[in-house]
Amino acid sequence: AEMARQLGIPAEVLDAAATAALDPSVTMDVCGSVYFPKDCHLSPSRFIAALESELRTLGVQFLWETDVHGFEVEGSSIRALKTSAGLVEADEFVLTGGVWSAELARHLGLRIPMQAGKGYSLTLASPRQLRARCSICTEARLAVTPMDGALRFGGTMEMSGLDESITQRRVRGITRAVPEYFPAFAESDFADIQP
């Protein structure tokens, strides 16, 4: 908390009773917490939907299910994208290919030091208890986020390139950690959930 305050981030050290008072509808097994009153979170899907809607009002065109194969370049400027839907011309381009940005940039002779990673999370659509606030259980490397009536439990990040396989040990780490901090939950709550 002290380090956060030195950086200008409001933070308060709370004992177990004060932690419980912040979210009285949820049972937590903790000695205390650090509360960040200005902390916030969002629903990624709602954020992206709102962003897309706003961009459309500004005249942005989206080409879904379209692969970029390369670029047409004049001098030091990109003139067009070569895509599975044909050439796409524009005055300016923004490279937002996520983990594929480095590969796309290579077509332009650029090197972007980027490596794909995957985070693990499990979401309970109808949780036994719904937290009002986010939590980070640092010892277990567990993030807990309420999202539109659901509760998401996020675990570790794995730097794995584009490998989409699931490491079951990491999934078990999440399902075992949740009841340690939130006794109303059990590992069996996650039995039918796919990461």
Which residues are covered by each model-predicted region?
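Helical element adjacent to the flavin cofactor pocket in flavoenzyme catalytic cores
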Residues: 2-3, 26-92
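Active-site substrate-recognition segment that forms the wall
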Residues: 70-78, 86-195
